[in-house]
Amino acid sequence: MINTTKIAKNNLKQNKSKSILIIITIILSTLMLSSIGIYIVNAGAYQKENTIKYSGNYQGILANVDEKQADILSNHADVELTGEMNGVGVEKLEDDSNISLAYMNEDALKLNSFEFVKGKLPTKENEIVLDSGALKALGYKNKDLGERIKISYNDYKNDKKIEKEFIISGILKTSEISEAGKYYYAIISESYMRNTRNMSQEDFNIYVKFNDKSNLSIEQIKEKLDKIANDIGLDTINTAVNENYINALKPDMETIMGGVFVGLVIVLSSILVIYNIFYISIVTKVQEFGKLRAIGATKKQ
C-alpha cells in the first residue's frame, strides 16, 4: 500500500515550486484575513467618530430644567459632566439662514462636539462666539477676533426684535449639517444672559454624561435619566436619550457578520487550493509509481 504521507513529504522536497505556491497561498490568506479584521475595527471607529461629530457624545438630555435644578444636577453623584444651554433668541435672514443665539457653558460645547477655530468662550457681557457660517451669513466673513458686529434677533420670551453690538471673542467651526441646513450658532456670555433675562423664569437644556463607564443600553440610560429627573423634581417626560451616540458605541453586527462570512470564504478557498495542490501532485506520483511497477520495478527501487 502506498504511503501517501511519505509521498507528500518527498513531493514537497522535490518540487519547490509547489511548496512556494502553498506558502504564498497561506501568506495571502493570512493577509486577507488580517485586512478584514482591520477593516471591521476601522469601520467601527469611523462610525463612532462620525456620530460624535454630528450627534455629540452626551448620553442624554434633560429639558426645561430651572436654575436651581441645574445646580443640583451638576453635583449629582451619577453625573460626570453637565452641559448647560439656554436659548435666548434667533435671527432669521433673507436667505433662509437662521442664527440661534444661546448661552452654553464649556461642557455643553464639549458634549456637542463644537470645535474652536480660534479664540475662547465669551466672559464679558458684550462678547460673543459665532461659527464661521454665521459670520458669513451676517456679511462678516472677514471679521476677526476683537472686532465688532451687530446682531438683530427675535427674543424667545417676548418676541421682541433686539439689536445688539458684540465683540467677537471666538470663532467656531461650522459643521456640514449646519451648513446644509443653514442653521448657525452664536454663543453669548453668562453675564449677558443674566443681565437680560429674568432667571427665575428661565429654563435650560442640560446635556448629561454619566460617571458609569460601562456600555449602557438605551433602556438603562433612560432609567438613569428618569431617576435623576425624579431626584431633582423634574417630570420624566423631559428626559431623552442620545440614541445615535449610544448605538454608535455598540459593535455593528452587520459589518461583523459580513467580515466573518468573507473570512470563512477565504479560509475555505485557501484550504481547497492547498488540498488540490497536494492532491494533483500525489495522484501524479502514484501514476508514475504505477508505471514503474508495471515495467518490473521493485518496491525498493
Region roles according to the model:
Residues 16-44, 250-291, 300:
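Hydrophobic alpha-helical transmembrane segments of multi-pass inner-membrane transport and secretion
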Residues 220-226, 230, 242-259, 264-267:
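Extended helical coiled-coil dimerization/tether regions that scaffold
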Residues 8-16:
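Short, Lys/Arg-rich N-terminal segment immediately upstream of the first membrane anchor
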Residues 41-243:
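Basic-flanked hydrophobic alpha-helices used for secretion and membrane insertion
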Residues 13, 75, 83-86, 278, ...:
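Protein kinase-like catalytic domain
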Residues 1-6:
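Short, membrane-interfacial amphipathic segments enriched in basic
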